[in-house]
Amino acid sequence: MSCMGAAVNIITTDGPSGRAGFTASAVCSVTDTPPTLLVCLNRGASVWPVFNENRTLCVNTLSAGQEPLSNLFGGKTPMEHRFAAARWQTGVTGCPQLEEALVSFDCRISQVVSVGTHDILFCAIEAIHRHTTPYGLVWFDRSYHALMRPAC
């Protein structure tokens, strides 16, 4: 699977069960009518209960140069330190939106399908916030790669 390049995303939530976030590349568009994304989340992950109970999330697609933030959200760093490392806005669902992301998709989880060790979260997009940073970041062959031309 390391040969499948993918955008790097930080998935965030905030709600009754608290604030949490993790790095994910297993994210993709499902349909534009209605606008829907999917996010894959391991049920064994420490953040799984928070996302499962809050039922909202924001997909923050990272820009070139945000590798350190991706690594921070992909590790065992306490949540308060993860969120303190960047500037955030609050989206319409109450989820944190990364100010310097390429784009943020504010979503409600509309359906969950379990496959093996993971849940596939189908996410109905409530709002989209495009940022001014034009260069994307992808994960390919177990390393980061900056897109050298504007992504959008």
From Swiss-Prot:
The gene is rutF. PANTHER family: FLAVIN REDUCTASE (PTHR30466), FMN REDUCTASE (NADH) RUTF (PTHR30466:SF1). It comes from Shigella sonnei (strain Ss046). It catalyses: FMNH2 + NAD(+) = FMN + NADH + 2 H(+). One of its GO terms (biological process) is uracil catabolic process. Induction: Up-regulated by the nitrogen regulatory protein C (NtrC also called GlnG) and repressed by RutR. This is FMN reductase (NADH) RutF. Keywords: Flavoprotein, FMN, NAD, Oxidoreductase. InterPro entries: Flavin_Rdtase-like_dom (IPR002563), NADH-dep_flavin_reductase (IPR050268), RutF (IPR019917), Split_barrel_FMN-bd (IPR012349). It holds the Pfam family Flavin_Reduct. One of its GO terms (molecular function) is FMN binding. Belongs to the non-flavoprotein flavin reductase family. RutF subfamily. SUPFAM superfamilies: FMN-binding split barrel (SSF50475). SMART domains: Flavin_Reduct. Its EC number is 1.5.1.42. Catalyzes the reduction of FMN to FMNH2 which is used to reduce pyrimidine by RutA via the Rut pathway. HAMAP family: RutF.
